[in-house]
Every structure is written in C-alpha cells, then in structure tokens.
Curated annotation (Swiss-Prot):
Pfam families: Uma2. InterPro entries: Nuclease_put_TT1808, Restrct_endonuc-II-like, Uma2. It comes from Synechocystis sp. (strain ATCC 27184 / PCC 6803 / Kazusa). CDD domains: DUF820-like (cd06260). Signal peptide: none annotated. This is Uncharacterized protein sll1609.
C-alpha cells in the first residue's frame, strides 16, 4: 500500500523545486508527492544486473540505459516517476537542458517490492502505457525467478508473457539482438 505524504495538490514545478532540496526521492503523481522506499540489496542487484546485460549498441543502433536516478516525465498524466531501469532506443528526449527527466523510453523495468508490487502492476503500468514510445514493460520479482514481460502489440493492446525459472530467456521486440 502506498502512503501519500502530502494532501496539498502541487504543480510539477513545485515538485521539482522540492526534489532539488530533498534528501530522499519521491515520485509525483498528478499533483501528489509519493515517497519512494529504500531498495533492498537484492533489488539493487537485480537492477544492476539487468542494466549490465542490456546491450548499448546493436549493429548501427545505439541505446541509452538509465538506472533508478533518472526521472521519467509523463505529460498526459502530469507525473514524474523513477523507474528502476529505462532503455531508450533513439536519442533521449529530455524535458529541459538540465537533462534530469526523459520522456521517451522504449523499455521500462521495475523490480517489485512487497510494498509497491500492486501499484507497479496496476496504476503505474496504466500511466506508463500512455507513453507513445514505450514498447515493453518488465516486472521482476525479487523473491523468486519470475518476470512478467508486457509487449505492446497494437494500439492499447499488450501481450503478457510470464517467465519462470532461472533459465528463462527474454526476447525484446524493440531491440533486435
């Protein structure tokens, strides 16, 4: 269950100003600030290992990979998130010259925690699905060998492939390996 830290509706500019001074990260969802809990060691291992396994270049195509500290701006819902891993299959589109938030990931991966698993699977994925460039969404279980891999197959259509076991392999549609 997510805990809302403030009840006052803020603007995105007010959130960014607060975030500059904050000692801990928080997400901004339609005017509300949501604190992000600290990540476990296993959560950090999974995030690091996934980002390390993703290629930065395939043929003549380059990819940008961002881990945990890069904000994602979703204009349609006026929300900022901190996905665990984002892959951008073209030039990153930043919200401004500070290059602190991107808008065009092709892949987003979230390592599930006990406290936020339901939110990541439902509400957050609902926000993410409005990103025009998003093609794939991974939900990684940190307690067992299980990954939910969502692939965009059409306008408002997503295909779920459930991967289980330590030898399961993922094929990404946006990344031709």
């Amino acid at each position: 269950m997510m805990v809302v830290a403030t009840t006052k509706i803020l603007t995105a500019a007010e959130y960014l100003q607060r975030e500059e001074q904050a000692t801990e990260k928080s997400e901004f969802i339609q005017g509300e600030i949501i604190p992000i809990a600290g990540a476990s060691a296993n959560h950090n291992r999974l995030t690091f290992n996934l980002s390390r396994l993703l290629p930065l270049e395939i043929g003549d195509r380059q990819y940008e990979i961002f881990v945990s500290d890069m904000r994602l701006w979703i204009a349609e819902s006026e929300s900022y998130f901190y996905p665990d891993v984002m892959v951008i299959a073209e030039e990153p589109k930043f919200t401004d010259n500070s290059q602190m938030a991107v808008t065009n990931p092709s892949l987003i991966a979230e390592v599930l925690s006990t406290s936020a698993a339901g939110f990541d699977k439902n509400q957050k994925f609902g926000f993410y699905r409005t990103i025009p460039k998003l093609q794939e969404y991974l939900l990684i279980d940190q307690f067992c060998y299980r990954v939910e891999h969502y692939q965009k197959v059409g306008d408002r259509q997503w295909l779920l492939t459930e991967l289980m076991g330590e030898n399961a392999e993922i094929e990404f549609s946006f990344m031709k390996i």
